[in-house]
Amino acid sequence: MEISVNKPAAEVWKRVGKFCDIAEWLRIPTCTITAGKDGEFGAVRSVAGEVLVAKTELSYSYTQTPSFQAGGRGGPRPYNLYHGTLEARPVTPTTSKLVYTLFFDNSMLADDMARERDIAQKKAQFTTALENMKILAEGGTLPPAPARGGGPGAAAPAR
């Protein structure tokens, strides 16, 4: 998933690229570093027990650990290899695009319909996140968050 931003990539990354900036643009109550140091390999954030596993000047990648997923919201679930990468990619000297890549295995879900629903939910959640990042990176203010369960298109709570 990606979105164009009318700001240089370095400025975009400075505004939305810290590991716990996720709380603002994904609209979750809080994010704290629970282990390690913010921005360093191995840092763990309170959001889904996610671990920083790779980074460049304008990107980072993270994973959810099997132990978190084993005790995750809604009870134990099979490990799905979930990884995410957020990148600010330069397009011109004054514009960029934010690219969010998710990698996961949802083959353990009951059937094709359940797998397609899972993918659609993730796309909706992270498309909304990208739209929020664009607003913030371009100097705007996010509109009020929809109420939880706010209907179609409402951002789902973090994993």
PLM region descriptions:
Residues 72-75, 146-159:
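Disordered, low-complexity segments in secreted/periplasmic proteins that are enriched in proline
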Residues 1-37:
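Hydrophobic ligand-binding cavity/cleft-lining segments
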Residues 11-16, 22, 52, 62, ...:
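Hydrophobic pocket/interface hotspot
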Residues 6-10, 52-59, 87-97:
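A short, structured loop/turn motif at beta-sheet edges
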